[in-house]
C-alpha cells in the first residue's frame, strides 16, 4: 500500500531499509549524492520519500506559507495566509492537490506527514540552525511545518514541528 505526504510532502514506500538518504529527480530517478538539482529525498531507513522545497517561485517555493486544512477542519480559505504561489486557497489541502497534479518525483498521492514521521527528519545535532540535514533539504526555512495529526481535544487545530531551536 502506497501513501504520500508533504514536507513536507512524503511518499511511503514498501522497500527494504538500508539507512541511507538519496536524492531523487522530479521524474523519480535516484540521483548521485553530489547531484546539484533534485526534487525529493528518499529515506531508506524509514521507507519515506520527502518533498524538497525550492529556491524558485512556484508550488514548492520555500517561502510559501499555508494554513492547515484537511477538508473538514482548519481554514479552507487560507484566511491567515495569502503567501503561496497561486495567491488563493493557501492551505495544506490545496497545496497537496497541486503537488499531486504535478506528479512530483513520479508520484501522485502525496499527503501531509504524521507528527511521528515528520520528527524523523529533525536533526538536533547538525551544523545548521535549521534543524534538518541541509545537504538534502537546503531550502528548508527555520519555521514550523504542518503535520496531518489534529489536536485530540480540538480537531480544528493540527500539530506543527519546529525546525529551529526554541520552537
Where are the language model's segments positioned?
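Glycine-aromatic-enriched surface loops/turns that form tight recognition elements
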Residues: 17-111, 115-167
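Sec-dependent N-terminal signal peptides
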Residues: 4-13
